[in-house]
């Protein structure tokens, strides 16, 4: 039994002894960052709840705001939420402004353009309501399918009535 412990100890020690060093750089000038996605080995897109999309150049630390056409209502837990890059396409989830303080969770896509992203909605949750809660909004891709979490907006019965 003692030899098993010795092997485990040596394995753990050898793995940690060969661990690579890494460097941590702090990204500043962000306001309530929510989601992030790498678009290359050297570039990262970050969403801010207020509605801004920031392009971060990892080597220089340069931060640039990317213009977009989304109608975002930042209210309570809502705003510009998750972001995902896949094959030159950017997907975002956000609380879409429908006027008169009504909003809903929407998902949009745009072709990658570092200067301006022109989004088109591919999903709009119904109905838009006056609530700043439970938008959900995490995005993931598996086997070429886009998955999204969508909240019940603090109105539990909406989720029970498809």
Task: Name each region found by the language model.
Residues 161-162:
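Short, flexible helix-coil linker/hinge segments at the edges of structured domains or between repeats
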Residues 1-3:
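N-terminal secretory signal peptides that target proteins for export/translocation
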Residues 19-158:
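Acidic, Gly/Ser/Thr-rich repeat motifs that build Ca2+-stabilized beta-propeller blades
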Residues 5-14:
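Sec-dependent N-terminal signal peptides
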